[in-house]
Amino acid sequence: MLKTIKNIFFISLFFLFANCDQTSQSKNNSNGIVVVKVFSSLTCPHCADLHGTIYEKLKNEYIGIGKVKFEHNAFPLDLAALNAEKILQCTTDTKIKMSFLTELYKKQNKWAAGSDIRVINESIKKIGEGFNLTQDQMNKCLENKKLEEKILNERIEAQKNYKVKSTPTIYLNKKKYEGKRDYKSFK
């Protein structure tokens, strides 16, 4: 009887320690992938600069070989940014979406400077056509209230859960990064 109790005790300890080890691995991201989560607005000049300097270098050095996972998170600061985000989300292909995102940031000073929202939307759609999006697809995305609600709810969640107050806000493996925004410091 005592031997059975000892065996049960040691088996329980084994499972307890095995479970603890598993938990610590997931917290420490044992697969070695660094998750870069960026909250940005497509009309934010600092976001465009960050994307142009840091994302492009990360893509070439780390994302392509699976060392870094980059997450763009919508945090629209105005209607133009919201509409650009809605059109960006028309595509479901991740590679195309990231290329489209890069192009929106590169051409931000052109499309975001329109005289009214209709002019801005047309400028965004011209860029979208270069990524195989049709006028009909983009118009449907612009008119999609559920998509708009989803984007705005994600923004609210970012404010609550990540304490995002401005753009760009960056998290590295769930830790807020507040250092310089040049690639050397970021790396």
Enumerate the language-model features and the residues they cover.
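Sec-dependent signal peptide recognition
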Residues: 3-11
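C-terminal cap of thioredoxin/glutaredoxin-like
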Residues: 41, 55, 126-187
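C-terminal motif of bacterial Sec signal peptides marking the signal peptidase cleavage site
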Residues: 16-19
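Cys/His-rich metal-chelating microdomains
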Residues: 23, 47-50
